A protein has these predicted regions:
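Bacterial N-terminal signal peptides that target proteins for export
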Residues: 1-9
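Bacterial N-terminal signal peptides
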Residues: 8-18
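Small-residue-enriched, tightly packed secondary-structure blocks
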Residues: 25-193
């Protein structure tokens, strides 16, 4: 029992250290013209997740306080499983205000103190996206529930000044902290690398 408690404490400390590093690296951005406002994001999330949730609104507010207004967002679903090493696969639609909508797929490996599986509906806020095609790359970060309120978890992933903030709500059980990345592609693939 003590070893389980020590493992959980270590996971929480590692996750907290990773979150602090991500927050320190990303200074709050000024509001971007043409970005999606909090009301638009909460409404889209309400329609997608099925219920209006105070937890969803709080997670979106936290993301906006850290990174400003996103110029795109993805609505989709994903599945993941892990036992030390893990995999995540998902698909959805990237919505932008002035560049149209785009079907995207994502996949990625993880490694860390992690075990379990989950299926999740996912909303990803996308910041500093210069064009829709710029989403097709790897976004690295520390995965796990960096910020967790009312059944919604938020993490942050970055690549080439673009920030992707997945907000997940799902079923299943996955406990731990891990390091990994998400790779976005224009077509579904089983290869997470």
């Amino acid at each position: 029992m003590r070893s389980v408690l020590r493992t959980i404490a270590a996971v929480l400390i590692l996750t907290g250290a990773g979150i602090a590093g991500l927050s320190a690296q990303q200074a709050p951005l000024p509001p971007q013209p043409g970005g999606f406002g909090p009301g638009e994001l909460v409404n889209a999330g309400h329609q997608f997740f099925g219920t209006i949730s105070r937890g969803l609104a709080q997670v979106i507010e936290k993301a906006i306080s850290l990174w400003g207004l996103p110029n795109g967002y993805v609505l989709g679903q994903e599945a993941s499983a892990a036992f030390v090493a893990g995999l995540r696969y998902g698909e959805g639609v990237l919505y932008t205000k002035n560049a149209g909508d785009l079907r995207v797929y994502w996949q990625g490996p993880t490694v860390g103190f992690d075990a379990g599986g989950e299926g999740a509906r996912t909303m990803m806020l996308v910041y500093n996206l210069p064009s829709t095609g710029a989403v097709y790359q790897r976004f690295a970060g520390i995965d796990g529930s960096a910020y967790f309120v009312g059944g919604f978890g938020m993490t942050a992933l970055t690549a080439n000044n673009i920030v992707v903030v997945p907000i997940r709500s799902g079923v299943g059980f996955r406990l731990g902290a891990n390091v990994g990345y998400l790779k976005f592609t224009p077509a579904a693939t089983w290869n997470p690398f």
